[in-house]
Amino acid sequence: EAAVHVFGEHGYAGATTDAIAREAGVSQAYVVRTFGSKESLYSEAAAYTFDAVREAFRSAPVPPGASSEQIRCALGDAYLELVADRSKLLMTMSLYTMGAHPVFGPLAREGFDSIYRVLRHERGLAADEAALFLARGMLINTVLGLRLWEGEGRENASELLSFLLDEDAEHVLAAAAAPRPEL
């Protein structure tokens, strides 16, 4: 959790094992001894994050024989719980920019593909429904990751999120804009 938080807020390049150790309440030596390297720790944090996303979608309560609409609503509720943890949102977004990295690129591709497989094959969304669900999620992640509401962008952030989230938009925006602890 500590590594996801620090990597999410600062990215791979900006995060340090010292900051992660402070966040976890352990020594930097312990972090290095446990994980070996920052790259290994980032890989573990990536796996943890993708596991959390997959598990959230797998465990979304969907009644037997549910319609596509009911499935999408349950998955949407699970997604809203995920974005409440800004660290996981930012961690996945940073991973999606690292496609060319020799270690993190394959992790990001497999993570994204595994989420798609959960939506399609385990939760039963049609290909177009899964693609639209992911596209909407990526746009929401982008608005939140950019902190679009800061400065002159608040109206645009509110408009975009209202379109994407309906009645949950202001709640998500308020939670995302809440002050974060300094790392």
Predicted regions, residues:
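Residues in soluble alpha-helical coiled-coils and helical-bundle/repeat scaffolds
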Residues: 36-40, 62, 66, 83-87, ...
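Helical hydrophobic small-molecule/effector-binding pocket
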Residues: 69-93, 98-106
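Hydrophobic/aromatic-rich alpha-helical bundle segments in the mid-to-C-terminal region
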Residues: 101-114, 119-183
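Alpha-helical structural segments
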Residues: 2-5, 9, 23, 33, ...
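Secondary-structure edge/capping motif, primarily at the C-terminal ends of alpha-helices
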Residues: 60, 64, 96-99
